[in-house]
Design a protein with these regions (language model features):
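Catalytic loop of the DD-peptidase/beta-lactamase superfamily, centered on the K-T-G motif
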Residues: 1-133
Length: 133
């Protein structure tokens, strides 16, 4: 969490801070991403999604404490690190979603896609529950 691995510094403290600090404005967050309200309780640092409000973020993405950071890959390659829970989760699928502005309508009209889109948050919820977090 602080830029070291096994006592060896690999990132400066400043780099870690910038990566894990939300850099998006309220105006940026007004716009959906991939047809979903991605920014609810989240922001984006340098190349990482960052949980800014766990209460708002949890219903859409599953649990993750304040400061949890992740990579929400558009094609299903997703990971999350929750420093407060000392937990790292990996969820890797390969799926080419509809990336158009009409993505939400495409998902709404396809029950299989709707289930696929909810699989990752279910995975997160079940993992936290199984670990008693």
């Amino acid at each position: 969490g602080d830029g070291t691995i096994d006592g060896v510094r690999v990132l400066s403290p400043e780099s870690v801070r910038l990566m894990r600090t939300d850099r998006l404005s309220d105006e940026h967050k007004r716009h959906n991403f991939l047809g979903a309200p991605f920014w609810v309780g989240r922001g984006f640092g340098l190349n990482l999604s960052v949980v800014t409000d766990p209460v708002q973020s949890t219903p859409l993405f599953g649990p993750g404490g304040l400061g949890t950071f992740s990579w929400p890959g558009a094609y299903g390659t997703w990971w999350q690190a929750d420093p407060g829970a000392d937990l790292i989760l990996l969820y890797l699928i390969q799926h080419c979603p509809d990336l158009s502005v009409n993505a939400a309508a495409a998902v709404a009209g396809n029950p299989g896609l709707a289930k696929l889109r909810t699989a990752q948050p279910r995975f997160v919820r079940r993992t936290y529950r199984a670990l008693g977090l």
